[in-house]
């Protein structure tokens, strides 16, 4: 039986344009990975979003989106709209914030207590380069060799949420005010029955692990000497007063990588993170395990959580405590973190009510499976004349992936780096029908395209940075993801 009943849906249409309906079934013999595999076999263009908090506890829900209604691909001020059964449509867009916000507002929906938060919305990515739509001085990007769009978002009205608390699957469908309610409600019941049959008939196939040699070759898009020279050049700009901090990077690639979803499975196993995501669309796939929120908006509260400062976990409890104190007392890490908190306050302040921006946590230590980070929490109240996407674009890209001052740092990054960043340093997440937004920074992320896997990583450079150390930091950050690819090749 669907919830809410058809009579309640009708009442809700007095205030909302879209109403989600829910169907629950027990799935205690199924994992989220099996759920995704089952649905991915039956439906095109699925995604999975999951979360593990810093106490290594799974977030309550894993979300699998199925059968998107349409896709919006933004590139060079043109949105290509792809919808099943229709010819592609191209729309010239001067203001992408207004374009995508209008879609969400056209699906305004209520929030139901005791049901999954994400019931439908736009899910996908915005590239690092989105800022070029609003900062006209950033007009000389490096070579765009990967040819990714500036944004790729799918409109999902069908989601299956796996409840880790009750071991139930919650099938979520959306009914629009413009639909014939009685017809659509019956159709929703039919779709739920079809999804239930698909799930019940699924027979997972156990793979036999491969006993193969580790033959994965990794290469960078620049030499070590080039990276060291970039750090030295960045320090010159800092010395001259152009910037205080900057985040140069390098991009690694692997030919003939293993299956992209197997890589996701290894990432969630070896790097459990607050933001875990996988999607495969058109000619590319993305698998990520990001530790860092970019921005979230809920009930007009805007939050960003800068992470800057990292040290490895200790092998013992005592070593872990020593490492924590070393991180907290490192003057370079503290100075860099403070700069990025100030940048976050400035970014949030652009869209928040005057006087509402506060730092609710300052330089606390959060522990993850292999490292611990310095993290701060910056909050504000979204102004009445601003939309959640305004908050996203005020922060994108994060200062932790660009530098401070942000625009000047990005101009220098364009000068130093040989290829356009694209997904790296951009954001992955969702814009929900209820008006909430939750996005992370696209780091610890693999892009699969052209039969290659691409992993990009960098590190913050300040006045006293040691080039060799910065090079090693970028390699170490990438290695966590590269190791997951190596392990996935054995599945």
List the predicted regions and their residue ranges:
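Extended alpha-helical targeting/anchoring segments
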Residues: 1-491
């Amino acid at each position: 039986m669907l919830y809410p009943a058809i009579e309640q849906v009708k009442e809700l249409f007095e205030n909302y344009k879209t109403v989600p309906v829910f169907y629950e079934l027990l799935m205690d013999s199924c994992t989220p990975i099996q759920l995704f595999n089952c649905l991915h076999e039956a439906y095109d263009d699925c995604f999975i979003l999951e979360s593990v908090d810093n106490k290594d506890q799974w977030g309550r829900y894993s979300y699998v989106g199925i059968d998107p209604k349409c896709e919006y691909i933004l590139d060079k001020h043109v949105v290509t709209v792809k919808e099943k059964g229709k010819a592609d449509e191209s729309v010239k867009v001067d203001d992408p914030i207004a374009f995508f916000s209008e879609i969400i507002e056209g699906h305004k929906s209520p929030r139901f207590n005791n049901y999954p938060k994400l019931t439908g919305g736009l899910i996908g990515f915005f590239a690092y380069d989105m800022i070029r739509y609003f900062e006209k001085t950033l007009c000389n990007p490096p070579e765009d060799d990967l040819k990714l769009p500036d944004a790729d978002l799918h409109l999902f009205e069908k989601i299956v949420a796996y409840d880790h608390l009750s071991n139930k699957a919650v099938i979520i469908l959306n009914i629009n005010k413009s639909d014939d309610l009685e017809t659509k409600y019956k159709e929703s019941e039919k779709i739920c029955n079809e999804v239930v049959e698909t799930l019940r008939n699924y027979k997972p196939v156990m793979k036999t692990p491969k006993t193969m040699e580790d033959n994965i070759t990794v290469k960078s898009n620049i030499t070590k000497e080039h990276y060291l020279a970039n750090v030295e050049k960045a320090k010159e700009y800092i010395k001259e007063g152009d910037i205080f901090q900057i985040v140069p990077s390098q991009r690694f690639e692997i030919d003939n990588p293993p299956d992209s979803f197997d890589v996701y499975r290894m990432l969630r196993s070896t790097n459990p993170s607050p933001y875990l995501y996988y999607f495969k669309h058109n000619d590319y796939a993305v698998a990520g395990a990001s530790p860092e929120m970019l921005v979230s908006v809920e009930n007009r509260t805007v939050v960003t959580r800068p992470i800057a400062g990292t040290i490895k976990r200790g092998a013992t409890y005592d070593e872990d405590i020593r490492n924590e104190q070393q991180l907290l007392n490192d003057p370079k890490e503290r100075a860099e973190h403070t700069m990025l908190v100030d940048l976050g306050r400035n970014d949030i302040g652009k869209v928040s009510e005057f006087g509402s921006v506060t730092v609710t946590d300052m330089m606390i230590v959060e522990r993850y499976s292999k490292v611990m980070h310095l993290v701060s929490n910056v909050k504000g109240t979204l102004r009445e004349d601003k939309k959640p996407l305004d908050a996203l674009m005020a922060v994108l890209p994060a200062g932790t992936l660009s530098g401070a001052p942000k625009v000047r740092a990005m101009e220098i990054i364009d000068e130093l780096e040989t290829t356009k960043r694209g997904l790296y340093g951009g954001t992955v997440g969702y814009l929900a029908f209820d008006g909430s937004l939750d996005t992370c920074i696209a780091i610890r992320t693999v892009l699969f395209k052209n039969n290659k896997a691409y992993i990009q990583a960098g590190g913050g450079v300040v006045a006293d940075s040691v080039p060799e150390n910065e090079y090693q930091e970028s390699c170490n950050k990438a290695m966590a993801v590269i190791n997951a690819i190596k392990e996935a090749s054995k599945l």
